[in-house]
Structures are given as structure tokens and as C-alpha cells.
């Protein structure tokens, strides 16, 4: 199977659409962080104070958070989360592993290709993140 055939197969035989959770083409969002009683901490969306430039996670929602200051000293909270993936045709989704973002995000499983090797057909499949 040549490269053109593989591309045609993937384009026609297996359509995988990815819709992102926080915006159309972005899996990250930024919002102004709340002010914590300790000026060196930012108030995260979880209601707790967090140090600047350190990550914290919500493993139940598969999200990663980060507080940072801009050049004007305003604190922001960056939220990264998994896209919502929809598999169609022969494609499937493999659930993410337990743990922190991005490992907890689902992965697309592209449908197996049948390749002939020494007179036998062998099925190959591969995974893509998101």
C-alpha cells in the first residue's frame, strides 16, 4: 500500500473529529485570577491559594492549572483541558490513563491497516494523542 493509498484510506475510511473543550480550536483558557489574602499567592478557581508559575491539577476533570503574572502585575489563571474527541467510522477512542493532564486525555485509535507480509495479512493500528 503506497503513501497515497494510506492517505486516501485515512481521509475516506476513517473520519475523526475533535472538538475542543474551551473554545473552538483551543484546549486552553486564561482568566483573571482572584486575589488571595497572601499577595504572593493567586486564588485559583478551586478556591485555594497557589504559588505563581507552579502547576496544580484536577484529575477528575483532567485539567491542569497555572497562575502567572503579566508585565503589569495582574495575576491570571491558565486552564488546560482535554478536547472532546468523537470517533467515526472504523476509528475508536482509547480512554486516557489515570493521573494528571495530559495523560488522562483520550487518544484516537486509527483503524488498523491490513498489510501483506510473507503471504499473511497483518493488522497494524496506531494511536494519536487527542
UniProtKB/Swiss-Prot annotation:
Key words, A-Z: Disulfide bond, Secreted, Signal, Toxin
GO molecular function: toxin activity
Coiled-coil region list: none
Keyword Disulfide bond: yes
PTM statement from Swiss-Prot or TrEMBL: Contains 3 disulfide bonds.
Sequence similarity: Belongs to the scoloptoxin-16 family.
Protein name (database record): U-scoloptoxin(16)-Er4a
Organism of this sequence: Ethmostigmus rubripes
Amino acid at each position: 500500500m503506497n503513501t497515497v493509498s494510506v492517505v486516501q484510506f485515512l481521509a475516506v475510511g476513517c473520519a475523526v473529529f475533535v472538538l475542543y473543550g474551551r473554545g473552538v480550536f483551543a484546549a486552553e483558557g486564561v482568566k483573571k485570577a482572584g486575589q488571595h489574602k497572601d499577595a504572593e499567592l493567586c486564588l485559583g478557581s478551586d478556591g485555594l491559594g497557589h504559588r505563581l508559575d507552579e502547576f496544580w491539577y484536577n484529575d477528575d476533570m483532567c485539567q491542569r492549572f497555572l497562575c502567572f503574572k503579566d508585565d503589569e502585575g495582574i495575576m491570571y489563571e491558565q486552564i488546560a483541558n482535554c478536547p472532546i474527541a468523537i470517533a467515526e467510522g472504523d476509528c475508536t477512542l482509547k480512554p486516557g490513563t489515570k493521573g494528571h493532564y495530559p495523560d488522562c486525555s483520550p487518544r484516537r485509535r486509527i483503524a488498523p491497516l491490513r498489510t501483506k507480509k510473507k503471504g499473511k495479512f497483518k493488522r497494524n493500528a496506531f494511536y494519536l494523542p487527542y
